[in-house]
Amino acid sequence: MTTSASQLQTQYSPAATEVRWQKLWEETSAFQANSQSSAEPYCIVIPPPNVTGSLHMGHAFEASLIDVLIRFQRMRGKNALWLPGTDHASIAVQTILDRQLREEGLSRYDLGREKFLERAWQWKAESGGTIVGQLRRLGVSVDWSRERFTMDEGLSKAVLEAFIQLYEEGLIYRGQYLVNWCPASQSAVSDLEVEMKEVDGSLWYFRYPLTDGSGHLEVATTRPETMLGDTAVAVNPQDKRYQHLIGKTITLPLVQREIPIIADPWVEAEFGTGCVKVTPAHDPNDFAMGQRHQLPLITVMNKDGTMNENAGQFEGLDRFEARKAVVAALEEAGFLVKVEDYRHSIPISDRGKVPVEPLLSTQWFVKIEPLAQRALEALNGEEGPRFVPERWTKVYRDWLENLRDWCISRQLWWGHQIPAWYAVSETNGVVTDSTPFVVAKSAEEAQQQAIAQFGPDVVLQQDEDVLDTWFSSGLWPFSTLGWPNQTEDLETFYPTSTLVTGFDIIFFWVARMTMMAGHFTGKMPFKDVYIHGLVRDENNKKMSKSAGNGIDPLILIDRYGTDALRYALIREVVGAGQDIRLDYNRKTDESATVETSRNFANKVWNASRFVMLNLDDKTPEQLGMAATADLELADRWILSRYHATTEALINQIEAYDLGAAAKQLYEFIWGDFCDWYIELVKPRLYGEDAQSRLVAQQTLAQILEGILRLLHPFMPHVTEEIWHTLNQVGEDQFLALQSFPQPQSEWIQPELDREFQLMIDVIRTLRNLRAEAGLKPGQKITAILQSDSESERCNLEQSQAYIRDLTKTEMLTIVESLTEEPQALVGVTATVQVLLPLAGLVDLAALQTKLSRNLEKVEKEIKSLSGRLNSSNFVDKAPAEVVAETRENLLEAEKQAELLRDRLTRLQA
């Protein structure tokens, strides 16, 4: 049922409105894309949030940006698809389930794999939809009929296909490599799951004696416990201090192992003593050096973070206890030289919250170089993708050029189980590094392969590990559209159009998607990559769960409405890729920024209600378009501003300058339309000239209809509600599916805009003078406008009716020069002097007293600000932005003082 204008509430109420439209959009499949449409496709796949997650402000920001792009392109006639979905988040889900089991006094091993996975799927069914429901609260225009999950049947098939293809091409292998190992979760973790944290630690200096007894070398380390696995000491080949020692050996203290002194250009002669201990099994740089010099790999740690049998007397100790014990033993033996305080960064497991241990482990790897090469060729050619902002292209290129082989196995149960089966019957029933294996799509296929290789009695055991979550995420842009099958969706919507993502995960995810897509589809997965910044809190700090400074978007949605939050976040963007700051009072759950956007929604609502109540119950279609010859000056001006705004808006959105687009709309709607045009046409709406009234109605209806379409991608709910009332259409039609306005260049008249701006400046100045004189709102005045320019005087003559109406001016005089100056308050625009004669209007003595007091107050402020700026203590120590703001305040105060002195001088004359 359509609401009439007279039935509209006097204030916009988002709570009921937003839920209603979200329900209607979804029930009618308003945003379902058609793979058979002849329209140009435009596709964005959602960066899949973790199925464990709940909506945070980063999600709200990203979803708001994507929805502007999707709604805009849909209204531009594109076959727009926003494909939703969630990620299975192996480590996150398993962490939650392990915690639940611990509370029950159980472990996953007590349950067994099958029961554990049943529980995981049950948890996913019950709790995994939270973030999807919260995304719906944002009013996102996704195609829910195409919702995907990284472990659904189709994506699981894609993961299997990708793994087997890569394995058969020799691009997946098992091997020993240093991985990021989390002793808490006892699993390899990706680089992305590691956070560098600065800590106050120590740098220990030890003597390593030369085997021939001729002296010693001094090495420094932050991890003394790993010295038990040293297999060399390295120096720079150009370091003259040590050139004579290269090739000799030292005897490793505590272990009594003889190890060589090697030369390697990686060693920085200036760092520490210029000698470094080399532990290839416990440090990535040492591992690379060990490969170059064919050094043995000695692991001294178990997977749980305790020391193993290679640690000798320290076997069984926790790694940090071993650190203390090793230092004590070296000190007692006379090998400790000194200890220095040392602040450095250590890698922390994002999930286990403990320091990561570089650990030698047999894992599954993807050979990255051939995949990265294909992505680099695309970047260097025409395929792209294009990064916005462009500066991220170089960083992306650097990542592709410096990637190491990707460890894809994780010691978890929740996820895509690696499709490899070990012939344990060949190695006494256990899996070892030498156990032969087969790779297959199913257990049955694996059995057939194994029987062919090892005979009918072969016993198989599937690899217990699962694939890194990023493996399935890397296939996301094309697997969600049906790959490896050649589906209509894949043919229509792939490559996708735009990827919208934050820079914090770009190179772990974006690079993997481009590499996988280039390899499996021969195409880059998206044309553009739009990088947005982070949402920072009221103290300009990065929001994070660990810092506890996140802001729940749903709290602000409940208080201000979805449209207000969406618009506030987008309007805060200053240039693509820049972080935004959101103010928030944690005691009251209030945000001035979001409140401003809520007020804007109310302004749009109230202005629309006023317009509709003055259209005589007619729709824009019924009123029709005004004849050009009948348009008055204000009509032509608002049409010029409307088409110029439309043109700018289209250019800004297509350039991903969404913050500028939001600001442009705000200024046009609140400023040009509400503050000026509506006020200018009110006399015509209430006047007796029927033709002038009709033209005003036609123009108001036309501009309001256009505004609702322009604003819809940013504020979809309030605009949908108003549009239905304005056009009196049923709930089976949607503004979301209407066409976006097209600018008509013949209506854009920059000269008219300049003329009208002159009038606006004059009206503002006169209003300010009225306020300064303390006049009552309805009190009539006379005014004088003085300009040297004949064309300006002519323009002011044409618009003087508007000036008189909006400033309550009875008599307006426009002159080239003043023959005599009356006692008046004087203001100036850029080119016009505006005089408000005061005779008979105010008590001049009282006004002079008021101005004098104001001047005294401003002069005190100038003295205070000058004092601060003359203090080197303030200028040198205060934050730069505070000093700059103080300088601006001083300039403003000096201008104000000059103006007040001028006014007092004129009044006293």
Curated annotation (Swiss-Prot):
Keyword Nucleotide-binding included in the entry's annotation: yes
Matches recorded under Pfam families: Anticodon_1 (PF08264), tRNA-synt_1 (PF00133), Val_tRNA-synt_C (PF10458)
Catalytic activity: tRNA(Val) + L-valine + ATP = L-valyl-tRNA(Val) + AMP + diphosphate
Residues given in the record as ATP binding sites: K545
Keyword Transferase: no
Motif ('KMSKS' region): 542-546
GO CC list: cytosol
Sequence motif: 'HIGH' region, positions: 49-59
Gene Ontology biological process terms, A to Z: valyl-tRNA aminoacylation
Coiled coil regions in record: 841-909
Record-listed E.C. numbers: 6.1.1.9
Highest rank taxon of the organism: Bacteria
GO MF term set: aminoacyl-tRNA deacylase activity; ATP binding; valine-tRNA ligase activity
Location(s) in or outside the cell: Cytoplasm
Quaternary structure and interacting proteins, as annotated: Monomer.
Family as reported in the entry's similarity comment: Belongs to the class-I aminoacyl-tRNA synthetase family. ValS type 1 subfamily.
Biological role: Catalyzes the attachment of valine to tRNA(Val). As ValRS can inadvertently accommodate and process structurally similar amino acids such as threonine, to avoid such errors, it has a 'posttransfer' editing activity that hydrolyzes mischarged Thr-tRNA(Val) in a tRNA-dependent manner.
Domain writeup: ValRS has two distinct active sites: one for aminoacylation and one for editing. The misactivated threonine is translocated from the active site to the editing site. The C-terminal coiled-coil domain is crucial for aminoacylation activity.
Annotated protein name in UniProt: Valine--tRNA ligase
Species in which this protein is naturally found: Synechococcus sp. (strain ATCC 27144 / PCC 6301 / SAUG 1402/1)
Gene name per UniProt: valS
